[in-house]
Amino acid sequence: GEAPGKSYADPYFGGEGPERNSCIACGGCMVGCRYNAKNSLDKNYLYLAEKQGAQVFSETRVIDVVPLNGKADGEDGYEVTTVSSTSLLFRNKRRWRAKAVVFAGSSLGTQDLLFKLRDKKSLPNISAQLGRRVRTNAESLIGVRLPNVDNMDSGIAIGSGIYLDEKTHIEATRYPRGSDAMGLLVTAMIRGKTDWRRVFIWLYTLLRLLVRNPRQAIGSIIPFGLAKQTIILLCMQTLDGHIDMLYKRRWYWPFSKRMVSFGPKIPAHIPEASEFALKTARRLGGMAGSLITEVLFNIPATAHCMGGAGMGRSADDGVVDVQSRVFGYKNMLVC
């Protein structure tokens, strides 16, 4: 019953946080709330840290972390080197000294930095377990585009979900109006094969769709209007699957190393999810779609990447201990 967009005192931290507004159902929760209604990082952790005297340096990238005073284990602290993450001409290199450091650059960002620091011998004692057991939610990003609808972009970004079976969950989600760039990665959904035949099945599907329903066929490759016409279906499963990451040179770019995955592949095609999307499309008169990387290359996408710097009893089976302290170093955590 509250009025959309109305301001309220901080409801989360006993009044210590900033004012918030009630939701106006713009659908922008996942891409960034513009109306002060979401409990985002700048309104909780960072806001409260700054209130206690911490300084936040935005648009800054860490490129080196070296133990001070020749103490290899970091007992005396670390020198941290940073550059601007947005300037192409002026790097604005700066050096900082800290008694302790915390790596919190998400799964991929933290792994990438730790790989680089170990490789350049700044932190050579980082465990060989770095990059092991990187997990996703075994998910598939699919959807249904409805050409005769123009209001699918209004509402809460993630509004409902159902279980197809004991291991498969699907959420109905949305993007706000104008957030159509994702449409460049969307194409008509195909069934079945996960090998090289998928490309030909996809071409056949597009040609058949072009003959039977030219409007849907053209709509499947044009991103404009995607947000207002699409129910995005995020499928996740509770299956035990993971990949491992290495830091190496690729044959097509031998000039520098980068993270690459290896080991058993995570499935890109989830039959239960595809059938659900196709049935939904038939019921609503729309077209089921999936990401072109899944269709052409059998490469899944994920919104949830986790792990890579896992806990263990020692450096032989983990990167950090149960208190997130990095093995081999003092005053260093991964969070």
Regions picked out by a protein language model, each given a short descriptive name:
Residues 98, 127-256, 305, 317, ...:
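FAD cofactor-binding and catalytic pocket of flavoenzymes
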Residues 2-4, 25-29, 63-66, 231-234, ...:
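A glycine-rich dinucleotide-binding beta-alpha-beta segment and adjacent secondary-structure elements
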Residues 35-39, 43, 50-51, 60-74, ...:
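Glycine-rich loop(s) and the adjacent beta-strand/alpha-helix scaffold that form part
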Residues 1-59, 298:
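Conserved redox-cofactor binding core of oxidoreductases
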Residues 45-46, 131, 274, 278:
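Short amphipathic alpha-helical segments and helix-helix/interface helices
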Residues 56-58, 103, 334-335:
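General beta-strand structural signal in soluble alpha/beta enzymes
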Residues 19, 32-39, 103-104, 263-270:
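Hydrophobic alpha-helical scaffolding
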Residues 2-14, 70-72, 79-81, 302-310:
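Charged, often glycine-rich, active-site loop that binds/positions anionic groups
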